[in-house]
Amino acid sequence: MYSPTLIDHFRNPRNAGMMRDPDGVGEGEYQACMDLARFYLRVRDGRVVEARFQTYGCGPTIATSSAGTELAAGQRLEDLAALPDARVEAAVGGLPGERRHAAEVVALAIRAAARDALRRLETARGPENA
């Protein structure tokens, strides 16, 4: 059984689509069912001000991606770089055991996007300001 939150995010996905000139991009993949999530982050002062996603996969992965963008908004990059799968799963009110991969894929993509943004910030600062 799926939660009302997950169903709402599936029926009304938020923040779907690409982002022009993102500050960070990351992907997560679950090869067993070929789910792929790509997250884009826009960052100001070390916090996410906008998150968008492109997801190819099952309904729960699409819905969890939508919820993941809301979860990421306002968060510090350092916190998102260590985002636990369980926190993403909680954002959709839980997932049945056979669909928990949705949270894993989305958390992986968010962590990768946050790490990419952190890497870009370090590069922009240069070694003398690190």
Task: Name each region found by the language model.
Residues 1-20, 25-27, 49, 75-130:
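C-terminal binding/interaction regions
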Residues 2-4, 31-32, 53-55:
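Short acidic/polar alpha-helix capping motifs at helix-coil junctions
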Residues 21, 34-36, 48, 63:
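Short connector loops at helix/strand junctions that flank enzyme active sites
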Residues 30, 35-45:
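Short beta-strand elements
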Residues 33, 55-64:
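Short, thiol/selenol-centered motifs that function as redox-active sites or metal-ligating centers
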Residues 45-56, 93:
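Immediate flanking context of iron-sulfur cluster ligation sites
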Residues 60-75:
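Alpha-helical support elements that line or immediately flank enzyme active sites
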